[in-house]
Every structure is written in structure tokens, then in C-alpha cells.
Design a protein with these regions (language model features):
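Hydrophobic alpha-helical bundle cores within soluble ligand-binding/oligomerization subdomains
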Residues: 2-218
Length: 218
């Protein structure tokens, strides 16, 4: 076999051929290597999974030595230069970049969920100590979303899953900005859905008293 690894067990003299796929062998293929019939089989020992791939992914490809990162086959540099954050989210979820009509629907569906229940701010976020770390506040708030949307537990319903995905993508910037501003003693800024996804996040983070926030163009 040209794409295989040949192993000779010096304990028994037995020889094994393990197929190599995409530069990897299956750990379970090692189980056939036994000293005798009572042997469980050879196991791979890799502390910290430093040289173990846990799964095959069609979403990302990473080659750290070569500096390669791809999402769904697209180089990350190309996506960073030519695509918006929400376009990349759509790509990761659906496998292809959205058409114009798909993007319009996708942006609408995400933007629809940017606001938080008032109790999330008044009864939950305001309950944190004044020097609580924003990351702890954010993680706690994300977990607390399940108490506001108990239907989210129905993971077998594809439509319901999509709604929860939309909620997470849309509400995470709102929660992150709210946690940050609370940590520095600044009042909460509501989402402004007239802005795009990134502009809205910057507005919620940095807006002070402007009637309408105008993000600095980069």
C-alpha cells in the first residue's frame, strides 16, 4: 500500500499495514497490534493531544507551520479583505458565501434579535459587584439566556436551532458591550439597528452622548 504505515511488532514479529489518510492514521487501527489474544491492543499515548487530531473538519483547515487558515476552503486573508463578519458567519454555518438575497435575509434575521430582555440588565447584570471581570459577566449572561428562551433546549428542531444561532450571534455583542461598560461605570447603550453589525458593536461600546454614533472609518 503506497499510502500506508508499515509497523513490525518486535514482540511477535507480526507486521501491520495502517492506511494513511490526509497525513493521519486512525488510533483505533493500533488496537489490532497485540502481543497475544488476551492483549487489549496498542493504544496511543499523547499528553495534551499535542499530536492528535480529534476530528475531521469541513469547516476549518489549519497549518500552523505554513501560516495557513481556511474557512470552508477560503483563505482567511481573502475573507478578511472582502467579506463582512456576518458573511463569514453565514459561510461557516452553511458552507457557502451568501448570495445578495440570502445576505439580506440573513442580516435581517440576525438584527431582529439584538435587544436583550430588560430583566437581563436590571436584575441580572446590575447584580454583579462593581469590580467583576467583564468576561465573567459575559459568560454568565450567555448562560442565563437559556432561562429567557427555554425552547432552546429543543435541539432536534432545525428551525429552532437556527433561531438560537441567530440569537447568539446578535446578542453576544450586546452582552459584551454591556459587561464592559458596567465594569467601567458607564450606562448601558441600546443597540442601534440602523448601523451594521460591527458599527453597532462599536456604538454600544464607546457611545457617550452623541445623538447618533458615527464610527471612525478604517
Amino acid at each position: 500500500m503506497p499510502n500506508s504505515l508499515s509497523i513490525t511488532d518486535n514482540r511477535t514479529g507480526a507486521r501491520y499495514e495502517l492506511p494513511i489518510t490526509d497525513g493521519t492514521i486512525k488510533a483505533l487501527d493500533l488496537r489490532q497490534i497485540k502481543a497475544d489474544d488476551r492483549d487489549f491492543g496498542v493504544m496511543a499515548y499523547d499528553p495534551g493531544y499535542l499530536n492528535t487530531a480529534s476530528t475531521r473538519s469541513s469547516v476549518t483547515y489549519i497549518d500552523g507551520d505554513e501560516g495557513i487558515l481556511r474557512y470552508r476552503g477560503y483563505p482567511i486573508e481573502q475573507l478578511a479583505e472582502h467579506s463582512t463578519y456576518l458573511e463569514v458567519c453565514y459561510l461557516l454555518l452553511h458552507g457557502d458565501l451568501p448570495t445578495k438575497d440570502q445576505l439580506e435575509t440573513w442580516v435581517h434575521d440576525v438584527t431582529y434579535h439584538t435587544f436583550l430582555h430588560e430583566n437581563m440588565r436590571r436584575r441580572f447584570m446590575d447584580g454583579f459587584h462593581h469590580d467583576a471581570h467583564p468576561m465573567g459577566m459575559m459568560v454568565s449572561a450567555l448562560a442565563a439566556l437559556s432561562t429567557f428562551y427555554p425552547e432552546a433546549k429543543n435541539i432536534e428542531d432545525p428551525q429552532n436551532r437556527n433561531i438560537q444561532i441567530n440569537r447568539l450571534i446578535s446578542k453576544t455583542p450586546t452582552i459584551a458591550a454591556m459587561a464592559y461598560r458596567a465594569s467601567i461605570g458607564m450606562p448601558f447603550v441600546y443597540p442601534d439597528n440602523s448601523l451594521n453589525y460591527t458599527e453597532n458593536f462599536l456604538s454600544m461600546m464607546w457611545r457617550v452622548a452623541e445623538p447618533h454614533y458615527e464610527p471612525h472609518p478604517v
